[in-house]
Each structure stands twice: as structure tokens, then as C-alpha cells.
Amino acid sequence: MYIVCVSIIIVCIWGCLGNGTVIWLLGFRIQRTPFTTYILNLAIADFGLLAVDFTLEIRWLQNRKQDEGIVFEFFEDIFQCMYNTGQFLLTAISIDRCVCILFPLWYRCYRSPRLSTILCALIWIFSFIFPGIHFILFLTAKKEHKYIRCYQYIVNGFICLPLMTFSTLILFIKFCFKTQRIRRRKLITVILLTLLFFLSFSFPMNAFYISHYIFESPTLHRIQYGYLCATLNSSVNPLIYFLVGRPKRGKPRRSMKVILQNVFKEEESHPDETAPSAETKL
């Protein structure tokens, strides 16, 4: 447990630095687009999750046991809110890219530029519902608060997992059958890698929580490994942006700002992606 806890703390520090850089650049240094609104909110959710988890792990190192009480439950519910937000945002991102690929003409001509902002606001509000109910029930000493998180993870599993898996498959199939020019697009590569890492790292925590509340299995060790997977998932996205967006060998190095611009402003500089679909419909 000590090794896992220290590993989580190291990953949290690294992830906070990466996501903090993304938040600073996308929020204040780079002109925002509808799609980068999703990425900015995702970075905020990941940063919040890592900061809260860092606090929880420090408290565990001090006490060497599972913390309890109002302070712990408050931070735990904030963690759950950030975790929910990340899941729903990635689901929205995957659906957004699928619509962009399957219906490119409609996406460019009729999609509202404010849609991403509205969806992000709704996702944040919805993500607070289950943790908020859990904290209120905890304060009123209701035993039902123990099962709220189980319901939360069941809802996440039935909503996010099928939609994200289906969208990832569509994106992967389209990516494989596109021309070499489109296949080299960095944005679709970033999205696919982000979704694959999320499906690999983030959903084990759903399984750990559901198995605990349904089968009443011991939690501490399993939940710690779930936290480790969640922190890895929240920390890996800035690294993906950097590795995919960096220039090839032999070319001069670029700043992180230029790398993010190359990755997330790609769809604006490639309007010809919709040409085949438009010509087919005409």
C-alpha cells in the first residue's frame, strides 16, 4: 500500500504540471474553438481529480489507515465529481468526432458553435448530482449514502462505456480505411489514444466500486489500485498531446503552445475533409 500511495503521489504531481500547462495555454494563450472547449474542460477535470487525490494520499501517509469523517467524505465526493466529469466529457468528445466523420457537411454547416459550451456546462452540473446527494445523506446520517456511489458507477458504466466503446470502434475503423493523408492527421490520433487509455485505465475503478458495494468485498487495496489507474488516466493526456504533436526528428523543436495549436487547430486547416461527402451528396 505504501508503494502504491507514493506512486499515486508522484503521478499526481506530474499530471498536475501537465494539465496545468494545458489549462494555461488553452485558456489564456490560444484562441479557443468549439472542440478545444472540450479539451480545456477535460484538463480542468483531470487537474481537479489529481489535486484532490494528492490530498487524500498525503492524509493516508500521515494516518496509515483509511480516513473517515466529514473532511474525507467532502474530498472523496469532489474526487467522484471530477471523475464523472472526465468520463462524460470523453464520451461527448468521442460522439462529437463520430458525428464530424459520419456527417461532415452537417457538422460544419449546421452545428451550433455554442453547443460544446452548453454541453460542458450541463456535464459539470450533472456530475455534481450523485456526489452532492451522497454528501447530503452522509451529513444527515442516512445509511443509504453508501449505495449512492454504486448507483453512480452503474449509471456511468451503462451510459459512458457503451457509447465510448462504440464511438471508439467507429473512429478506429474510419481511421484505418482513410487515405494516408487523412491517416496522418494528428487530431484523430490524439482522440483515439485518449479514448483507448481511458477505457484501459479509468473503468477498473467502476468495477472496484461496484464489486465492493454489491459483493461487500474488502475495499482499501482494490480502491487504491483503482485510484492509481484513475490518476494514470488523468495524467497521460498532456503527454499524448506532446508526443503526437511534436515535430519529427531532424526538425527544430517547438514550444508546447505551438504543439497544441498544431494538434487542436488541425480541423480548421483541413476543410477539404468534407469535400468527398459533400460531392457525394450533391
Annotate each predicted stretch with a short phrase.
Residues 199, 203-210, 219-280:
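Seventh transmembrane helix
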Residues 5-12, 25, 48-65, 79, ...:
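Helix-to-loop junction signature of class
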Residues 40-43, 117-121, 151-155, 188-196:
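Internal alpha-helical transmembrane segments of multi-pass membrane proteins, especially GPCRs
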Residues 1-20, 60-61, 74, 137-143, ...:
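Extracellular N-terminal segment of 7TM GPCRs
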Residues 102-129:
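The cytoplasmic-loop to transmembrane-helix boundary for the fourth helix
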Residues 1-12, 32-93, 98-103, 107-110, ...:
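Extracellular TM2-ECL1-early TM3 structural module of rhodopsin-like
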Residues 166-203, 207, 259-264:
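Intracellular effector-coupling site of seven-transmembrane GPCRs
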Residues 30-35, 67-70, 108-116, 182-187, ...:
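Membrane-helix interface segments
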